[in-house]
Amino acid sequence: MRLYIGSLLICVLLGIVPFATANTNRSGYEEHRNYLLNIFHNPLVNDSIKEKNIPELIAFYQRYPTDIPLSDADRQQFERFIHDYREYREVLVDGVPPQGGSFGNIFGHFLGRVGTRYISSLFNKKREEGQSNHANSPTTSPSRIQKMTK
């Protein structure tokens, strides 16, 4: 009987733990995504701040590689950017990695092509999720919008 109760308790715990961590991971995903969008999708943020947050963007990409839809070509370009960025950061000047400043060509290439598509995909996914959430909620439009549609 003890073995039966112990086995039942273990099964219940194994069923609860993944469920609880799934919600935690999802909220962490949303927080991280919103943080990155506030930096990379905001035209008021300057390039030096964006450069400082590239490691965060890379960490997000590697943690959630399939959550953002990218074409195979875009994914390969992003992987190449990560490789180039890490290679640049490994270069030592007097025994230490580079201490800030612009790394020009790599960052320019990233913002011009791959980064823009990745951030746009990240933003579009957020917008699609927001629209599906709004479609399911019975809220009314703000009064200024109601006046415009009448």
UniProtKB/Swiss-Prot annotation:
Compositional bias segments (type: Polar residues): 132-150
Residue ranges of the region described as Disordered: 127-150
Keywords per UniProt: Immunity, Innate immunity, Secreted, Signal
Cellular component GO terms, alphabetical: extracellular space
Localization (cell): Secreted
Endpoints of the signal sequence: 1-22
The organism's place on the tree of life at top rank: Eukaryota
Gene Ontology terms describing biological process: cellular response to heat; cellular response to oxidative stress; innate immune response; response to bacterium; response to heat; response to oxidative stress
Biological role: A humoral factor that may play a role in stress tolerance.
Family, similarity comment: Belongs to the Turandot family.
Name the UniProt record assigns to this protein: Protein Turandot X1/X2
Organism, scientific name: Drosophila sechellia
UniProt lineage: Eukaryota, Metazoa, Ecdysozoa, Arthropoda, Hexapoda
Encoding gene, per UniProt annotation: TotX1
